Amino acid sequence: MWNPRGQRVVVTGASSGIGAATAVEFARLGAVVGLVARRRQQLGEVLEACRETSPDSQIFVADLSDLEAIDGLVTTIIATLGQIDVLINNAGVPKRRKTSAVTVADAESVMRINYLSPVALSLAVLPTMRRRDAGHIVNISSMGAHMVSFGVGAYSATKAALEYFTEAMYVELAGTGVHAHVVVPGTTLSEFSTAKDGNDPPFRSDPKLAATPEVVAAAIVASLSDDRFITYATERDGATAASRNADPNAFLFSMRDRLAGLGR
């Protein structure tokens, strides 16, 4: 069983939603948390909650779309916290737009944050983890990588890319003390799923079927005690993915029939 007490855990996208809940949960369990996001005020509010149980936790304000600055960010975090034992790549942005309306600029911008940024962060922390022969990289994916919903093709593609990169790390790091895996949330009750500029309105879903950020945070913590590559945030998400993987064509036929007419 992995023990979080005293571990240095870095959480990106920690100013709200899953990231904030994850940071607070690790702090509650005794980890020293490094909170990374762009929004200083919101980060400060989450830091206050973390410091109630983890007084040495710190914030690092950063724009993760600036890939050239990521090595420097990691150097600063290590200098402040001492080392990084666990990296939770949670930061992400939505892109809700039909494929026929997506621009190359749309695709590039969402790929930069959702895929290239966690790749760059993973590559930046790997050398020190390999030297210590210890560490965890947890990349937060999405059910969108397993069942593309209407109007989120560009977003889903970024999460599928992240899963395959992480899968390669998982295999290549076998036999070392460094581990990489993904956690897959479905629809979550957070601002990520609300209306945003530059996006079509969120697809309507039953809020009773959505997970809370705290449920996802608990799944992230639990995944560190498991050797599996993929952890679904809820049993329902896992069952949906299993159904899709059992017969992708039948699953997509059913989805296409249910959504027929929305694309007109």
Regions found by a protein language model. Give the residues of each.
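The beta1-alpha1 cofactor-binding region of Rossmann-like NAD(H)/NADP(H)-dependent oxidoreductases
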Residues: 61-72, 104
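Substrate-binding pocket helix/loop in short-chain dehydrogenase/reductase
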Residues: 98-99, 103-108
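Conserved glycine-rich cofactor-binding loop
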Residues: 8, 15-16
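Conserved glycine-rich Rossmann-like NAD(P)H-binding loop of the short-chain dehydrogenase/reductase
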Residues: 29-46
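Active-site helix of classical SDR
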Residues: 122, 158
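SDR active-site lid
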Residues: 171-236
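Residue(s) in the substrate-gating loop at a strand-loop-helix junction
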Residues: 142
